[in-house]
C-alpha cells in the first residue's frame, strides 16, 4: 500500500546558530506536526557534545563551540499534544578524521539523533578543501566516511544518516552533484547500503535538498535511494526546517519522492 508521509524527523529550533528565527520554538514545531496530522516530529538542533574532543581546525569550533548540551537542552521539557510524539534529538557531524560529535552516554539520553557525513561546505572540518574541490574527492570521502561510521558501536535503532544527497554533497551545482552520485555507484556502495540495512540505521530523505527543476539531477537522486531500497534500507523524512517557511514544502516534496521510490510502510524507519 502507498505510504503517506506521517512524520518529520529533522527540524531545527531558533537555537540552532544557522536559524536565529525567534518564532521557531518547540511549541511552533509541535503545532506544525499537529496541523499536518503527523504521528511524530523530532527536534534536531545542531550539536557537539562537550565531552567529545573537537578537532581544532577549519569551520567547526566557531560553529559548534557554543552549541553544546546546556545550549540545546534549553528547549526541555518539550511540549506535548495527544496523538503525536515529540522526539528530542540532535544533528551531529562526523569530522574528516572520523570523530562523531556525540558520546554513547549522551545518545542514551536522547530519543533520536542525526549523523551527517556530507556537510562538505565545512571544509577542513568535515572534508579537506582539496577533496571538496572535485567530484572524485567528494565521492571518495563520502564512501570512506560511511564505511568507517558503520564500524562504530552505536545505538543504530535510533540513529539516522542525514542528507546523503543534495547541495551539501554536490555544492549546489546539478551537474557536479550528478557526477558525485555517478562516482559513488558500484559494489562498495552496495556493500555499505546492505550493512546499513543490517545495522538498522535510518536513511534520511531530506526534503530541503530535493531540487525538482533539473530532470537529470532528480533522476540521479531517485536512483541513489532506489539502490538503497533494493539493499534493504529503511527511510525517514526530514524537512531540515530552520525557519517557519521550511515547513511549507515538506509534505509535497516528500510525497513526490516516496511515490517515485514506491515506498510502503515496510520501507519506513521508525523510532
Pin down the residues of each PLM region.
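Charged catalytic cores and adjacent phosphate/nucleic-acid-binding surfaces used
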Residues: 1-15, 26, 31, 174-271
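Divalent metal-binding pocket/active-site signature
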Residues: 48, 112-195, 199-214
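Histidine/acidic residue-rich metal-binding segments in metalloenzymes
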Residues: 65-81, 85, 105, 134-160, ...
Amino acid at each position: 500500500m502507498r505510504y503517506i508521509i506521517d512524520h518529520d524527523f529533522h527540524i531545527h529550533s531558533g537555537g540552532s546558530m544557522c536559524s536565529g528565527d525567534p518564532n521557531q520554538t518547540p511549541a511552533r514545531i509541535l503545532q506544525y506536526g499537529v496541523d499536518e496530522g503527523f504521528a511524530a516530529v523530532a527536534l534536531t538542533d545542531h550539536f557537539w557534545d562537550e565531552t567529545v574532543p573537537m578537532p581544532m581546525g577549519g569551520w567547526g569550533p566557531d560553529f559548534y563551540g557554543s552549541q553544546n548540551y546546556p545550549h540545546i537542552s534549553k528547549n526541555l521539557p518539550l511540549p506535548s499534544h495527544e496523538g503525536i510524539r515529540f522526539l528530542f534529538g540532535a544533528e551531529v557531524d562526523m569530522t574528516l578524521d572520523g570523530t562523531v560529535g556525540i558520546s554513547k552516554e549522551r545518545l542514551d539520553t536522547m530519543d533520536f539523533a542525526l549523523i551527517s557525513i556530507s556537510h562538505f561546505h565545512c571544509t577542513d572540518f568535515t572534508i579537506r578543501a582539496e577533496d571538496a574541490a572535485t567530484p572524485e574527492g567528494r565521492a571518495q570521502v563520502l564512501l570512506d566516511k560511511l564505511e568507517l561510521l558503520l564500524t562504530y558501536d552505536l545505538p543504530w535503532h535510533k540513529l539516522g544518516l542525514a542528507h546523503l544527497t543534495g547541495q551539501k554533497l554536490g555544492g549546489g551545482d546539478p551537474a557536479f552533484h550528478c557526477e558525485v552520485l555517478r562516482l559513488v555507484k558500484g559494489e562498495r556502495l552496495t556493500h555499505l547500503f546492505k550493512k546499513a540495512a543490517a545495522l538498522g540505521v535510518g536513511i534520511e530523505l531530506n526534503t530541503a535538498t530535493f531540487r525538482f527543476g533539473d530532470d537529470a539531477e532528480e533522476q540521479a537522486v531517485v536512483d541513489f535511494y532506489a539502490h538503497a531500497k533494493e539493499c534493504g534500507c529503511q527511510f525517514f523524512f526530514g524537512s531540515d526546517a530552520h525557519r517557519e517557511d521550511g515547513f511549507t514544502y515538506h509534505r509535497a516534496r516528500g510525497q513526490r519522492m516516496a511515490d517515485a521510490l514506491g515506498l510502503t510502510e515496510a520501507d519506513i524507519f521508525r523510532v
